[in-house]
Amino acid sequence: MMHALGDLFKPEEKEIKMDRDKCSGACVAIWTWKTIVRLICLIAGGVQVFMGGYIFYSISFTKDHSVQNYLSLSVVGFYACLTGLLILFAETRTRWTRRAVKVFVFLCNGLSRGIIYILIGAIDQSPIPFKFLNIITSMHIGLVCIAGGVVSIIEFLITYRRNRARLNQAIANHQQQAKGTELYDLFEREDFNNPEDAAAYDLEKGKDPNYIHQDLEMQPVQEA
């Protein structure tokens, strides 16, 4: 009985709506920073894939023809290609890929994505048999991946704080709009001098126009 009474006077819950972020100076700065971060991460993924492909290509002219060398080059090349494609997928993802590929859902979070990039860069610091133009080694590519991971984490922290502030503001606005419930309107109704105006007000609010100018406790009780 009490639950039914509570449901009767329970206000209708409305969905919390977040206002679109106004494009201010801070918005432009954050958008520019996110674009730079994504470009850095795309470069890191591209060079990682290039390193894997070059290692596979080096199998054709290696001087060590042992099975162990072939296996090690194949494993390292596969690892580099896989991690590079993973980085490229994470940075070029769309709303469709986020919903369709549930396995890579952790790549949608800037914090976890940055940690994974740093881990990939740390593994690249190991002695991987890669040297391009006698200058670029796997250590340099690993440093690029680590840089992409660091800036990705910084981006996450900046946007998280801003989005959290927007969410708190949306919740405050929602609570302010939902403040006028049926009970509040019932006991705080306007005082009309004209009974016709009061009846029209009650009809507008969906109430019985026969009970005008009286609150719930002040209404007369009809004896049986």
Swiss-Prot record:
One Gene Ontology CC term in the entry: membrane
Topology versus the membrane: Multi-pass membrane protein
Pfam family membership, one: COPI_assoc
InterPro entries from the UniProt entry: Golgi_TVP15
Keywords, alphabetical: Membrane, Transmembrane, Transmembrane helix
Statement: the UniProt record of this protein carries the keyword Transmembrane: yes
Subcellular location: Membrane
Superkingdom assignment: Eukaryota
Segments traversing the membrane: 39-59, 70-90, 103-123, 139-159
Keyword Transcription regulation: no
Signal peptide coordinates: none
The protein, known as: Uncharacterized transmembrane protein DDB_G0281339
